[in-house]
Amino acid sequence: MSGLRVYSTSVTGSREIKSQQSEVTRILDGKRIQYQLVDISQDNALRDEMRTLAGNPKATPPQIVNGDHYCGDYELFVEAVEQNTLQEFLKLA
């Protein structure tokens, strides 16, 4: 797969995960950065793919990947936004 992908889930009881997913997509949309939203709740293989790319068997959404390169999770994303290094974080620069 190529391009920027945000792994998310449409089925979660966690308000924190919902809020984090929403913030990531809101920021990307606001900066007009194109990405594909990958819903891991539709297929266990997608969840496994996300965890393999993240290098963490317990990783939870949102996770951000560009091509086959893992960018990071929500905390790293927010840190990049705050430090104005989002392009580098997303491996777009």
UniProtKB/Swiss-Prot annotation:
Interacts with MYO1C (via its IQ motifs); the interaction is dependent on calcium and takes place at membrane ruffles. May be glycosylated. Could act as a modulator of glutaredoxin biological activity. May play a role in cytoskeleton organization. GO terms for biological process: cytoskeleton organization. This is SH3 domain-binding glutamic acid-rich-like protein 3. InterPro entries: Glut_rich_SH3-bd, SH3BGR, Thioredoxin-like_sf. Glycans are attached at residue 9. Residues 2-93 form the Glutaredoxin domain. Gene3D superfamilies: Glutaredoxin. Belongs to the SH3BGR family. PANTHER family: SH3 DOMAIN-BINDING GLUTAMIC ACID-RICH-LIKE PROTEIN, SH3 DOMAIN-BINDING GLUTAMIC ACID-RICH-LIKE PROTEIN 3. It is found in: Cytoplasm, Cytosol; Cell projection, Ruffle membrane; Nucleus. The modification N-acetylserine is found at residue 2. It comes from Rattus norvegicus. Signal peptide: none annotated. Expressed in heart, liver, lung, kidney, spleen, thymus, ovarian follicles, skeletal muscle, brain, lymph node and mammary epithelial and stromal cells (at protein level). GO terms for cellular component: cytoplasm; cytosol; nucleus; ruffle membrane.
